[in-house]
Structures are given as C-alpha cells and as structure tokens.
Amino acid sequence: MTYNTWLVLHILGVVIFLGNITVTAVWKVLADRTRNPAVVGYAQRLVTVTDIAFTATGAALIAVSGQMMAGRFGGIGGAGWLTLGFALFIASGVIWITTLIPIQIMQARLARRFGRGGAIPDRYWRLATLWYALGAIAIALPLANIYLMVAKP
C-alpha cells in the first residue's frame, strides 16, 4: 500500500478511536448523573460494546498504519515527535488495559445486578470516580498526539 493509503487508514483510526472514547465518556457521565439504575446499567453495557467495536478497532488501525508509515521518518526512534507520540499512545493503552478496562468490567458486573432494578451500590460510584479521572488522562494523551502528528515539532 502507498504512504497515502496508510495515512488515510491512520486518520480513520484516529477519528474512530478518539471519537468513541470522547463520546463514550460524555454519555457515560450524563447517564451516571441521572442516577437511574436502568439508564446507568444500559449505558455501562454500551461502554463495553462500543469499546470492543470502536476503541479497539481504532487503536488497531492507528497502531498498524503508524508502524507502516514510521519507516518514512526513520522508524519509531527516527524523529523525536514520533518517539514521543508512540510513547503517549503506549501510555494511553497502558491506562486502558491496566485500569479502565478492569474498572469497566467491574462496573458492568455491578450494572447487571442493579440494571434490572435496585439501588446502585456505592462501589459503582467509587469506581466511576476513578474511571472519570483516569479516563480524562487517557483522552488527553491521544489529543496531545494529534498535535505531534500534525505539527511534527
């Protein structure tokens, strides 16, 4: 494939990835604010579905296309902006894999119970607070990547 084809795939991956993590965070916060167990439970299930369908797909497109284009700039270590961008992408992935996904799994298990009726347990809200804080960081890192990939400082 040509460089431009990989670039289009890379941009598509960024749009899918960043679009999903941003929109998911917004509607999860809005659903949680209702404190309605049925709404919160439904939103929590959708977080899992959309992460599998869109976040993972976008991340895969970014990773593969980024690797394929990196050679044009001397590889991942060939340019400072590329090295930093790769590090930010990995850091965001580490946050997702080590904390956000496990939190989502725990919240989904809790949501299965209260989504059919019943009170939302305090543990769900403690996990939600942690998810919001770490999620903000996991969103900020790819946003910084956009600057690096466009400006190439």
Region spans (language model):
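Polytopic transmembrane helical bundles with strong interfacial aromatic enrichment
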Residues: 1-153
